[in-house]
Amino acid sequence: MSTIQETSENLLRFCGDQKYATIYADPPWRFQNRTGKVAPEHKRLNRYETMELEDIMALPVAQVAAEKSHLYLWVPNALLPDGLAVMKAWGFEYKGNIIWEKVRKDGEPDGRGVGFYFRNVTEILLFGVRGGGNRTLPPARSQVNLLRAQKREHSRKPDEFIPLIERCSPCLLYTSPSP
């Protein structure tokens, strides 16, 4: 059985017949250079299995999303177009984003990030909706789209995002194929 098939079946089994009004996803993006090779630093570290863009797009997220629902989708800066494509494939329309500014304990930017053109100290949480007239909850309308938080273990997103999302959108489902 393929990884994508197993992952899809696990998601559907976990959700059962439940449809979720809010989905928070952090797919295991695969980074490749122009020749299609996996970036050496990612290949060397091999922390967890990653997925091809087409496999992420094929995940059955639309099947577990309510008719009117919100999607919060993490995407690395370099893969922004891919993140937008995934959002569309899952049946969501892009509406905005929240930027995570990665900081050190002293509050200064954490310049340890990687980047071919710039040293990345941010990551993007895309926000999309499914279904007409589907606004965020009232607290979201005063929420700025920047959150400064410390970087933790590799790929771990700040815990501070969960209560933010819970204030802004109903009934959260967290899906993360990566560990």
What does each of the following model-derived ranges do?
Residues 113-172:
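Flexible, glycine-/basic-rich loop-and-beta segments that form/coincide
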